Structures are given as C-alpha cells and as structure tokens.
Curated annotation (Swiss-Prot):
Organism per entry: Pongo abelii
Motif Nuclear localization signal per record, residues: 42-51
Chain segments carrying region NLS binding site (major): 149-241
ARM repeat start and end residues: 77-117, 118-161, 162-206, 207-245, 246-290, 291-330, 331-372, 373-412, 413-457, 460-504
Assembly, per entry: Heterodimer; with KPNB1. Interacts with ANP32E. Interacts with ZIC3. Interacts with NSMF; the interaction occurs in a calcium-independent manner after synaptic NMDA receptor stimulation and is required for nuclear import of NSMF but is competed by CABP1. Interacts with APEX1. Interacts with RAG1. Interacts with CTNNBL1 (via its N-terminal). Interacts with AICDA (via its NLS). Interacts with SNAI1 (via zinc fingers). Interacts with DCAF8. Interacts with ITSN1 isoform 2. Interacts with TALDO1 isoform 1.
UniProt modified residues of type Phosphothreonine: 3
Free-text description of this protein's post-translational modifications in UniProt: Polyubiquitinated in the presence of RAG1 (in vitro).
Ligase listed as a keyword: no
Domain IBB: start-end pairs: 1-57
Name this protein carries in UniProt: Importin subunit alpha-5
Gene from which the chain derives: KPNA1
Family label: Belongs to the importin alpha family.
One cellular-component annotation, GO: dendrite
Entry comment, domain topic: Consists of an N-terminal hydrophilic region, a hydrophobic central region composed of 10 repeats, and a short hydrophilic C-terminus. The N-terminal hydrophilic region contains the importin beta binding domain (IBB domain), which is sufficient for binding importin beta and essential for nuclear protein import. The IBB domain is thought to act as an intrasteric autoregulatory sequence by interacting with the internal autoinhibitory NLS. Binding of KPNB1 probably overlaps the internal NLS and contributes to a high affinity for cytoplasmic NLS-containing cargo substrates. After dissociation of the importin/substrate complex in the nucleus the internal autohibitory NLS contributes to a low affinity for nuclear NLS-containing proteins.
Length: 538
C-alpha cells in the first residue's frame, strides 16, 4: 500500500473493498487539471505600468493635493529606444530637475514600448542603484514616484531582471514607502512589491521576511482610491500564492480578516484577487482550511459562485472546492451555506473549466458521510453528473466519475440503487476503454461497489442472481473488463481479473475480439456484433 500524500490521494489502495474518506477526498493535482494555464489566463502575477494616452501628452500630476505639476517639458525618446549618454549624465547629475527629467525619460522607455528595453537599462552601470537611491528622497515625492515606476516595470520582467531590483536593496525601501504620506508613492510601491512577490516563491518569501504584511494591511484601514485597493489586494494574493513550497502560514494568515471584508467590495478585480488569495490559503492541510473557515468567509464565497463575472466565479469556486477537501465537519460548513444549489447551476455553465471545477468540488462532498451524500441526492445533482459523464470533455468527465464512484464507495444500499436507477452503469463502463489508467481504476472501483451491493441483494432475496451483472453485460462492460485482464497496469489487470472471477465466473476468451485502439479519442474501440441480414442459420 502506498503512503498517503497529496499526490496519491486519488489512487491509494484500490485492492481495499472501498476507499476511506481521507483517501477519497482529493486535493488538486497540477498535472491533470491544467491549473497553471488557467491561472495565467485568469490572473496576472506581474503587471507593467503603461502610460495612458493622456500621460503621453502631459506630465503626470500627483493626485494628492500636496503635489504640484512637474514643470518638465516632454522629451523625445532616442530612436529605437536606445539609452543616450545625455540620459545617463542627467541621471547622475546633482540637479534635482535633471534627475527627475532623466528618470521620467527612463520611465517612458520602460512603459511605452511593446518590448521595453529592460536588459539595456539594467546593464547600464549604476542606473538601477541610482533609482533605488531616488526612492529615499522624501523631500522630492515626484522623483520617488517616477523612480518607483521605473523599478516596478523592471520588476515586471523575467526572474533575472526582478532579481536585479532585489539585489539593489529596493524591497525594504518599497516597504517603507507603503507608509508614505503620498498615495501615488504608496500605490507605486505596492505595485512594485506585488511584481517582486509574484516572480517566484523565493522572492515571495523574501518580501514576507522583510515584514511587508503590517504596513500593507494598514493600507486597507483607510479610504483609498479604487486603483490603490486593487493593487494592494493583488499584491496580497501574490504573497499568499505558491505551493512548492507554500508561504509560511503564520506570516500570511493575518490577512484573513482583511480578505473577509474585501469580499464585500463591489469591484470585480478586488473580488477576484481576494478570492484567489483565499483559494491559496485554503489549499492545504485541515488546519489551514479551519483558519479560513474561522475567518467567516464561507457564506460569502458561496454567494460569489453566482456572480455574473467568471473572473470572480473561478477563484470563489476554487476556494470552496479547497475547503471541502477538509474533514466532514469542515465540508458541512459549506453545505450549510446552501452551496449545492449554486454548484448545480455551475454544472450547466458554458465554461468547461467551471463545470470541471464544480464536479471536482462535488466529488469531495460525495467523499463525505452518508448524510452528505444524501444532500447531494436531494439537490438533484446526480442526474446532471451522469449527463456530464456521458457528454462533456474528458477532463470534466473524469471529475464526474470521481463524484459518482465516491458516492458508491461511501453510500448506503439505497443511495447506490438510486445511482444505478439513474443510469450510472453505462457511462462508468464507457470509461473502461479510455487511456487514462487512473480513471479506468476509478470506474472499476465504482462498478465493483455496485456489484458488491448486488451480491448482498442476491444473498438476501435467496435468488443467487446478482441483478447488476446483467446491466453491466448489457452496457458491454463485461467485454471491456475481460479485455482489461491484459492491461499493462498491474492494479487494473488484477482488479479486472478479480471482478470476472468473483462476479461473472470464468469463460473462454476469444482473442479475435480484442479491440482496436482509437488514439484520437484516447480509448479502445469495441466492435458490436451484428446478426446477418437473413438471420442466423441454425
């Protein structure tokens, strides 16, 4: 028997008669659920501050009342974005006016170009260190802001470019600037720190170790303009993100109280990033899940499953799904928030990734106790799951298969009969021909649970006939199980052999009926025998 762990929760001990709840509950598997791609599509880990059209025609005016318009004329960029000797000379001059003018010119290079010359900037000796030095100029907030903007855009680049900003000592200074009296400076510092934390787990942990959280959370305690709140919660989500390794929970858990009220902000960007942060914090052991539950966010997360923007629904669903990977009591908290009605609605979503995530979430609920399985039945969810099992994309069918097999593993006799009456046997048999060995095992396990119930019924009613054997044969399941006796996976062929021997008896095999392989559909093809037109000759 393999050792339990996050990566093998799904397939532990298939030789057992049933999976226990801890084994049936499944945390996310990166490989199967294509999370990295989805996250890239729905959430940016780095953002470049690009000048707007208005900013291209006039110098920026710091929004705080204490700022005055910079009295600097627009300067022409060098052809091709090349850094000129004049720019370098001005950046190192002692004149504050020339320093600001040159910094603005660097900023424009890094924010206006489709492919900003970040490498050229960081390879110019002393320039990055000079911008970091400008961050300290409390007497010149405009210079602080412009240099912070430059460094933000450098940190929006690749890991090597981000590391240059870190090595120049910018992070502790940016954290100090979170307490600046000027909101523009604060906001640009938040943006820079979000880019740095979003680069890698190593950068994230370094920013956390520099004690960013207290001043960052303090920003939320006052009335901010919307862009500030957006940037701050985005930076917060980057600080919570990452699994290899996750951030030290004690360092990020203080943000839970702030996240709980951010869920009630109406802006979709704020909502989305707050939900992403909660999904990261709830992705782990039960003690982390409990901390998220204790923050009082569950009911609001469930409400957000019905939001009209998928940008919010996706991370809210991820967070809800992570919470139900916990124990039965933790799962019940979500059920008590009327989550099943929302999940049923999401099963008909036109967005396939939402359907898949909803099926995954339900599969962890059906891994619970019989009362919880009954709530799924009462919510009329299984008909939708069986429909998905027959018609959806394969990645979604896989999750629906888990939901149904989990219910057959932990359900009562009446609950399993209900699933059979809904028609779960045929789609489970259809999965026996797919190339994904894990899902073949899931389907075999579900069928075994059904056959075991049939055996008990046969003994109880004295007929000696297992009523479910015939249903499996009618669905061409027996042919498929027989073929699996030659499967390359040892657990699959052993399971197939055991099922044939125990429930169907032994029959001579005909090698001529071995199925062909359809590589496009990732499954085997079983030819259905047809009678001759004139009928069989006796």
């Amino acid at each position: 028997m393999t050792t339990p762990g996050k990566e093998n929760f799904r397939l532990k001990s298939y030789k057992n008669k049933s999976l226990n709840p801890d084994e049936m509950r499944r945390r996310r598997e990166e490989e199967g659920l294509q999370l990295r791609k989805q996250k890239r599509e729905e959430q940016l880990f780095k953002r470049r501050n690009v000048a707007t059209a208005e900013e291209e025609t006039e110098e920026e005016v710091m929004s705080d009342g204490g700022f005055h318009e910079a009295q600097i004329n627009n300067m022409e960029m060098a052809p091709g974005g090349v850094i000129t000797s004049d720019m370098i000379e001005m950046i190192f001059s002692k004149s504050p006016e020339q320093q600001l003018s040159a910094t603005q010119k660097f900023r424009k290079l890094l924010s206006k170009e489709p492919n900003p010359p970040i490498d050229e900037v960081i390879s110019t000796p002393g320039v990055v260190a000079r911008f970091v030095e400008f961050l300290k100029r409390k007497e010149n907030c405009t210079l602080q802001f412009e240099s912070a903007w430059v460094l933000t855009n450098i940190a929006s680049g690749n890991s090597l470019q981000t590391r240059i900003v870190i090595q120049a000592g910018a992070v502790p200074i940016f954290i100090e600037l979170l307490s600046s009296e000027f909101e523009d400076v604060q906001e640009q510092a938040v943006w820079a720190l979000g880019n740095i934390a979003g680069d890698s787990t190593m950068c994230r942990d370094y920013v956390l170790d520099c004690n960013i959280l207290p001043p960052l959370l303090q920003l939320f305690s006052k009335q901010n303009r919307l862009t500030m709140t957006r940037n701050a919660v985005w930076a917060l989500s980057n600080l919570c993100r990452g699994k290899s390794p996750p951030p030290e929970f004690a360092k990020v858990s203080p943000c839970l109280n702030v996240l709980s009220w951010l869920l009630f902000v109406s802006d979709t960007d704020v909502l989305a990033d707050a939900c992403w942060a909660l999904s990261y914090l709830s992705d782990g052991p039960n003690d982390k899940i409990q901390a998220v539950i204790d923050a009082g966010v569950c009911r609001r997360l469930v409400e957000l499953l019905m939001h009209n923007d998928y940008k919010v629904v996706s991370p809210a669903l991820r967070a809800v799904g992570n919470i139900v990977t916990g124990d039965d009591i933790q799962t019940q908290v979500i059920l008590n928030c009327s989550a099943l009605q929302s999940l049923l609605h999401l099963l008909s979503s036109p967005k396939e990734s939402i359907k898949k995530e909803a099926c995954w979430t339900i599969s962890n609920i059906t891994a619970g106790n019989r009362a919880q399985i009954q709530t799924v039945i009462d919510a009329n969810i299984f008909p939708a799951l069986i429909s998905i099992l027959q018609t959806a994309e394969f990645r979604t069918r896989k999750e629906a298969a888990w939901a149904i097999t989990n219910a057959t593993s932990g359900g009562s006799a009446e609950q399993i009969k209900y699933l059979v009456e809904l028609g779960c046997i045929k789609p489970l048999c259809d999965l026996l021909t797919v190339m994904d060995s894990k899902i073949v095992q899931v389907a075999l396990n579900g069928l075994e649970n059904i056959l075991r119930l049939g055996e008990q019924e046969a003994k109880r009613n004295g007929t000696g006939i297992n009523p479910y054997c015939a249903l499996i044969e009618e669905a061409y399941g027996l042919d498929k199980i027989e073929f699996l006796q030659s499967h390359e996976n040892q657990e699959i062929y052993q399971k197939a052999f055991d099922l044939i021997e125990h429930y169907f008896g032994t029959e001579d095999e005909d090698s001529s009926i071995a199925p062909q392989v359809d590589l496009n559909q990732q499954q085997y093809i079983f030819q259905q025998c047809e009678a001759p037109m004139e009928g069989f000759q006796l």
